[in-house]
Amino acid sequence: MMKLVLFGIIVILFSLIGSIHGISGNYPLNPYGGYYYCTILGENEYCKKICRIHGVRYGYCYDSACWCETLKDEDVSVWNAVKKHCKNPYL
């Protein structure tokens, strides 16, 4: 009986772990529709700068392209991000 209870607890814990998602994000796109490629993997100023342009505070180089944490789908394109975050009414 004790083994069955322990097994049930383990199954519940693994199901909870599976439902926890990591921090979402996206690869931002440049004005030509391509990725911003990078060579220094991990944190670097280039990717942080690119992510700030897209309206996100933090990003890093992952799989040779800049990855921005918490970047929403509608802000992936640089033009959509600029229109959303810029105060210029002519955009």
From Swiss-Prot:
Cross-referenced Pfam families: Toxin_3
CDD domains: neurotoxins_LC_scorpion
InterPro entries the record matches: LCN-type_CS_alpha_beta_dom, Scorpion_toxin-like_sf, Scorpion_toxinL/defensin
Domain LCN-type CS-alpha/beta: 24-87
SUPFAM superfamilies (alphabetical): Scorpion toxin-like (SSF57095)
PROSITE patterns reported in the protein's UniProt record: LCN_CSAB (PS51863)
UniProt KW keywords: Disulfide bond, G-protein coupled receptor impairing toxin, Ion channel impairing toxin, Neurotoxin, Potassium channel impairing toxin, Secreted, Signal, Toxin, Voltage-gated potassium channel impairing toxin, Voltage-gated sodium channel impairing toxin
GO CC annotations on file: extracellular region
Similarity comment: family membership: Belongs to the long (3 C-C) scorpion toxin superfamily.
Protein name from the UniProt record: Lipolysis-activating peptide 1-alpha chain
